[in-house]
């Protein structure tokens, strides 16, 4: 293989600057071929030029991995015998020379056609895919950690909300207990247990007890139901008692007018002992009006009183006459 033809073709494509670089590189390359021992020059450089760019760079920078790369290349069209002695070579450490060799190794890829295109497309794509996978895995792990943190924080937040709600309920219950103390009363259905309703209930119970006492005093009042009817019956009974007392007082006064019965004080004391103090004022006022009611008595009452008065006067006149006769 003539190296100058490949370099001329490459220089024709690249330009005058690339042509000069190719001429200089060809001179240096010939110098290397002439200086190297004859046992190692059998087709190894031609194989290097026919290799892809990435493999040539790896072989030039990492000579220890030449055996593994030679095995991968043997799977293609190149024979394994051409690359085996190339693994023991030592290349110069000039970076410019290595870059030029890697650049001009594209000639072999253009000559090989599909094989070089497949290798060139497959090799750079794999590292990118691996990098994408490596980048994606930490993102997934980060997302999982974030989800776990969010779930943990949400659980803590719910626990805090529950604690706050329980504390607020306790505070409300304590405030209510301070405001309204608990009343140990077993209330029936429809009955309240607050202080006002309890006071009203006690007042009604007292009134009912007094009404029962009045019903016991008034005859025939036990059979009557209803507060209004009971009160009417009590009023009628009291009025009848007043009339009876008036009649008795008038008869006593007609029989012996000298006897001064202090009926007002007697009746007031008796009524006070029998009835509640709330009726004392009314009864005393009514008793004060009883003497005046005698003037408004019916005619039959006045006639009876007149006969009684005449009888008393006749007895009084007879008594002194009898005394005179005895004398």
From Swiss-Prot:
Nucleus among keywords: yes
InterPro entries recorded: bHLH_dom, bHLH_ZIP_TF, HLH_DNA-bd_sf
Entry keyword Transcription regulation: yes
Protein name: Transcription factor bHLH48
UniProt main location, coarse: nucleus
MF terms in GO: DNA binding; DNA-binding transcription factor activity; protein dimerization activity
Localization, UniProt: Nucleus
Domain bHLH: 191-241
Tissue specificity: Expressed in leaves, stems, and flowers.
Domain of life: Eukaryota
Any one of the GO BP annotations: regulation of DNA-templated transcription
Gene3D superfamilies: Helix-loop-helix DNA-binding domain
Quaternary structure, from the entry: Homodimer.
Pfam family, one: HLH
Keywords in alphabetical order: DNA-binding, Nucleus, Transcription, Transcription regulation
GO cellular component, one term: nucleus
Region annotation (Disordered) ranges: 137-179
